[in-house]
From Swiss-Prot:
Assembly with partners or alone: Heterodimer of LeuC and LeuD.
Keyword terms: Amino-acid biosynthesis, Branched-chain amino acid biosynthesis, Leucine biosynthesis, Lyase
InterPro entries, alphabetized: 3-IsopropMal_deHydase_ssu, Aconitase/3IPM_dehydase_swvl, AconitaseA/IPMdHydase_ssu_swvl, IPMI_Swivel, LeuD
Cited function: Catalyzes the isomerization between 2-isopropylmalate and 3-isopropylmalate, via the formation of 2-isopropylmaleate.
Name of the protein this chain belongs to: 3-isopropylmalate dehydratase small subunit
Length: 193
């Protein structure tokens, strides 16, 4: 996993509350276990019409929002079933930061495990941030827990454990590998033959 220290990017805004994992990525696209290739199905039922043409009224389809790497959204994002495909789709689409009023617990952890930073922010701050010009770069500084635009500065908090994992690019496997020697020593001690 790539370390996450400072991220600069533009934002897309989807201020709906209670966006569940079925809306993030519909069930018909969950037949694969690879982590890539899901971005094209992100918010599929909202992004496309019945003829697979882009819905011009969906915020992520606005030309000025294409390429956004920060998603500003409503409360209780990622609720519903706990499929990891939802964070895979968001990451594959290009999002690195998700800002919401709150997250479903398992979805929140899955974001972190996949190198994305989920930030909990109150509605007034999100609405202020959502007014940022579509072309303006927003800077997210994880180490100092600060987000800045050309005109505003926002503070956010994150649990120390998750912060350290993201800053150092550590996933569960790389953390386990830090103890490889201890694991081998233990296996030698308890070997049955």
């Amino acid at each position: 996993m790539e370390p996450f220290r400072i991220h600069k990017g533009t934002a897309a805004v989807l201020m709906n509350d209670n966006i569940d994992t079925d809306q993030i990525i519909p069930k018909q696209y969950l037949k694969r276990i690879e982590r890539t290739g899901f971005g094209k199905f992100l918010f599929d039922e909202w992004r496309y019409d019945n003829n697979r043409q882009e819905n011009p009224n969906f915020p992520l389809n606005a030309q000025e929002r294409k390429g956004a790497s920060i998603l500003i959204t409503g409360d209780n994002f990622g609720c519903g079933s706990s499929r990891e495909h939802a964070p895979w789709a968001l990451a594959d689409y290009g999002f690195r930061v998700i800002i919401a009023g709150g997250f479903a617990d398992i979805f929140y952890m899955n974001c972190m495990k996949n190198g994305m930073l989920p930030i909990v922010m109150d509605k007034d701050m999100r609405e202020q941030l959502a007014k940022t010009d579509a072309r303006e770069q927003i800077t997210v500084d994880l180490e100092n827990e600060i987000m800045t635009t050309n005109t505003h500065r926002f503070h956010f908090t994150i649990e120390k454990m998750w912060k350290e994992k993201l800053l150092n690019g550590l996933d569960e496997i790389s953390i386990t590998m830090q103890y490889e020697q201890e694991i081998k020593e233990y296996e030698r001690k308890v070997a049955l033959h």
